[in-house]
């Protein structure tokens, strides 16, 4: 606590203080929207609307109820205030994984006219200090991969790149393409599970899976998997793509409480394009989709097939970690 307190006693950082959900929520939402609105997906826009709804709840009882179990909502962090205006923000979200506690830094944002004054650095330093105080083992954040200024800032503070991921979005009516001859699309079978699980673990590594909505045990065939997604209120459908009796990949559709459902693709680099070019036209023809769908996938992979099918890349993020 003494280390954190010393941050706020510094005259240089007199504008830096902890985020107060009771009075900062609306101003933080405005700042986040200004800085990131153009790159937000439907779920991000829903996130902002919930922040603003919470700002109207003076007691925050409704916000607390919504935030229970939802690790993405900003109930902690730091802001930079000048002249009674919030001009900088950093949200801190706590995650618990087996054997360790992780903090995720989100919504690191500063109004343009206040940039290049060290505000983002001061916010990040304060959050790192608090993470150490809370006995976190690591801190993660995401940054646009082409934002070299931010990447260099975080690198100078001890963050190292861990992954590059692209989020792809598609509206049901925008799906395109015809399936090539020779591909066979079926519901996923129990015999496919071992290979599917291996590919999922490769495409969605454990070190980043904690921040995704992917729970691999929920995709397991049989009663165990059914019980997992039943009690977690998760609805899924899964399809296997084969050619000449060889499994090319497995695609999972997962319903979401947010504005876009999710795809999870289990396929290796050598067959992911063939798998997508077979399964996506099948899904379009059978009209399985009713809502927008989002696919999080390693950057640079399956690009041509996804674009041909009507997907658009929303962003490519560099995932960075600082070990504490």
Please give the residue ranges for each predicted region.
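Conserved catalytic-core motifs of GNAT/GCN5-like acyltransferases
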Residues: 142, 160-173, 312-322
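Conserved active-site alpha-helix within GNAT-family acetyltransferase domains
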Residues: 117, 121, 145-163, 298-315
């Amino acid at each position: 606590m003494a280390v954190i307190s010393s941050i706020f006693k510094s005259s240089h950082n007199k504008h830096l203080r902890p985020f107060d959900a009771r009075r900062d929520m609306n101003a933080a939402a405005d700042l986040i929207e200004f800085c990131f609105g153009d790159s937000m997906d439907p779920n991000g826009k829903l996130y902002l609307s919930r922040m603003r709804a919470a700002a109207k709840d003076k007691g925050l009882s409704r916000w607390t109820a919504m935030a229970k179990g939802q690790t993405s909502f900003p109930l902690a962090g730091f802001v930079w205030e000048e002249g009674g205006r919030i001009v900088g923000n950093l949200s801190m979200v706590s995650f618990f994984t087996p054997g360790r506690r992780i903090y995720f830094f989100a919504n690191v944002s500063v109004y343009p006219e206040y940039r290049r004054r060290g505000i983002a650095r001061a916010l990040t330093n304060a959050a790192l200090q608090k993470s150490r105080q809370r006995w976190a083992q690591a801190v993660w954040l995401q940054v646009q991969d082409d934002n070299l200024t931010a990447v260099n800032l975080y690198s100078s503070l001890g963050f190292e790149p861990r992954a590059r991921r692209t989020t792809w979005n598609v509206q049901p009516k925008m799906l395109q393409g015809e399936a090539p001859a020779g591909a066979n699309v079926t519901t996923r079978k129990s015999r496919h599970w071992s290979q599917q699980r291996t590919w999922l673990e490769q495409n969605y590594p454990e070190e980043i899976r904690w921040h995704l909505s992917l729970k691999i045990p929920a995709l397991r065939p049989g009663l165990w998997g059914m019980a997992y997604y039943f009690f977690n209120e998760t609805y899924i459908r899964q399809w296997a793509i084969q050619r000449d009796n060889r499994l090319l990949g497995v695609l999972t559709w997962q319903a979401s409480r947010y504005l876009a459902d999710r795809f999870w693709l289990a396929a290796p680099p050598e067959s992911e394009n063939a798998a997508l070019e077979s399964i996506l036209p099948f899904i379009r023809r059978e009209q399985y989709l009713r809502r927008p769908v989002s696919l999080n996938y390693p950057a640079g992979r399956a690009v041509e097939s996804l674009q041909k099918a009507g997907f658009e890349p929303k962003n490519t993020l560099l995932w960075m970690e600082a070990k504490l």
